[in-house]
Each structure stands twice: as structure tokens, then as C-alpha cells.
């Protein structure tokens, strides 16, 4: 039976981790053990961050919609409810962009939702 020495495999694995850790400060980018811990932690943070990004953008869109609709004398919840009753299926992102970019179209939309 031939003895298996894992030198190449281990070196590749360590190089991969150290490459991911490039840009970190101090030992976090130089020493394998510390870099491995930091890479694992940063990957967890980035995973959670991608989930939080969706929540934060939705909050931002709702906040913008509420501000824009209150200028027209209607609050956010009533606006969304009336749009739902009229079967206007625009999501919060596109409504928010409409309120920011094309304010006249948004005003017409709010006026049509009042009827």
C-alpha cells in the first residue's frame, strides 16, 4: 500500500483560504489558523447581510411611499389597500421609484386610487 502524503492538497486548501483573507488586517491575512476563522466569520456576515439587505430596502421603499402619499393627503396603508382593491399590481419598489422620478404619474395614481 502506498503512503498518501497530502502536501499538495493541504497547500491548495491553505492558499485558497489565504486568498479569501487577502485584504484583512495583520495576522488575519497572514496566518492560516486566524485567517480561517476570520474567513468563516466574514462569510457568515455576508450571508446574513444579503438577507438584511432585502428587509432594509423594503423598509426604505415603504418609508418613501408613505412620505410621498402623505403629500397627497393619503397615508401608506390606505394607498396600498386602495391599489389592491383596484387590482393595480405595482410592487413597492416600482411605486417608490415612480414617486421619486415621475411625481406627476404618482399623483395621478394616488388620485385614481381615491375614487
Swiss-Prot record:
Superkingdom of origin organism: Eukaryota
Localization in the cell: Plastid, Chloroplast
One example GO MF annotation: rRNA binding
GO cellular component: chloroplast; ribonucleoprotein complex; ribosome
Keyword Chloroplast in annotation: yes
Matching SUPFAM superfamilies: Ribosomal protein L20
Keyword annotations: Chloroplast, Plastid, Ribonucleoprotein, Ribosomal protein, RNA-binding, rRNA-binding
GO biological process: ribosomal large subunit assembly; translation
One family name in Pfam for this protein: Ribosomal_L20
Gene3D superfamilies: 6.10.160.10, Ribosomal protein L20
Entries under HAMAP family matching the protein: Ribosomal_bL20
Record function comment: Binds directly to 23S ribosomal RNA and is necessary for the in vitro assembly process of the 50S ribosomal subunit. It is not involved in the protein synthesizing functions of that subunit.
UniProt family annotation: Belongs to the bacterial ribosomal protein bL20 family.
Designated name of the protein: Large ribosomal subunit protein bL20c
Amino acid at each position: 500500500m502506498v503512503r498518501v502524503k497530502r502536501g499538495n492538497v493541504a497547500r491548495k486548501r491553505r492558499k485558497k483560504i489565504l486568498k479569501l483573507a487577502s485584504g484583512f488586517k495583520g495576522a488575519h491575512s497572514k496566518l492560516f489558523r486566524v485567517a480561517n476563522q476570520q474567513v468563516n466569520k466574514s462569510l457568515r456576515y455576508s450571508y446574513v447581510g444579503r438577507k438584511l439587505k432585502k428587509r432594509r430596502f423594503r423598509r426604505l421603499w415603504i418609508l418613501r411611499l408613505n412620505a410621498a402619499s402623505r403629500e397627497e393627503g393619503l397615508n401608506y396603508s390606505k394607498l396600498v389597500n386602495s391599489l389592491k382593491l383596484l387590482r393595480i399590481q405595482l410592487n413597492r419598489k416600482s411605486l417608490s421609484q415612480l414617486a421619486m422620478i415621475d411625481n406627476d404619474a404618482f399623483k395621478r395614481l394616488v388620485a385614481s386610487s381615491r375614487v
